[in-house]
């Protein structure tokens, strides 16, 4: 009987510990490192060339084309933070789906209506201040 009580109390303690709020900070993401210091600004402008707003595309792969003016997309190995150099982050339905080092990408997107935007971020994957983001592009992927 003593063994059962010990096991039951141990199980109860584990359940309580699992339900308690975490005291450790969440894992750092690229955006979290922005607090480390002031962010540079960038005069670059970004445009989603394809798909276009309101377009219906055959799925499940969407050919994405991005255009940038006043900035250069650099390789992943670049670490210097410059206002005219960085990477492209692509979001579909508010989810980061790609950290791209080029201007074109074939992205798997399920059938349905979706919202896409792209962001030009510094070489450390942290946004410029102010952010360099395209307007939302609403498109539909046909099955």
Where are the regions a protein language model picked out?
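C-terminal motif of bacterial Sec signal peptides marking the signal peptidase cleavage site
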Residues: 15-18
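Long, low-complexity serine/threonine/glycine- and acidic-rich segments characteristic of extracellular
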Residues: 39-41, 54, 61-143
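Bacterial N-terminal signal peptides that target proteins for export
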Residues: 1-9
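Short, compositionally biased P/S/T/A/G/V-rich stretches that sit at domain boundaries
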Residues: 30-57
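Bacterial signal peptide processing site
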Residues: 20-22
């Amino acid at each position: 009987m003593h063994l059962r009580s010990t096991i039951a109390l141990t199980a109860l303690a584990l359940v309580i510990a699992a339900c308690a709020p975490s005291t450790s900070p969440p894992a750092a993401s690229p955006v979290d490192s922005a607090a480390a210091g002031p962010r540079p600004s960038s005069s670059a402008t970004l445009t989603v060339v394809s798909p276009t707003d309101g377009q219906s595309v055959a799925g499940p792969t969407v050919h994405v084309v991005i255009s940038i003016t006043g900035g250069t997309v650099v390789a992943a190995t670049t670490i210097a933070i410059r206002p005219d150099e960085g990477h492209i982050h692509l979001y579909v339905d508010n989810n980061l789906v790609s950290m791209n080092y080029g201007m074109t990408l074939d992205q798997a997107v399920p059938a349905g209506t979706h919202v896409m935007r792209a962001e030009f971020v510094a070489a450390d994957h942290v946004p410029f201040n102010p952010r360099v983001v395209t307007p939302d592009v609403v498109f539909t992927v046909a099955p």
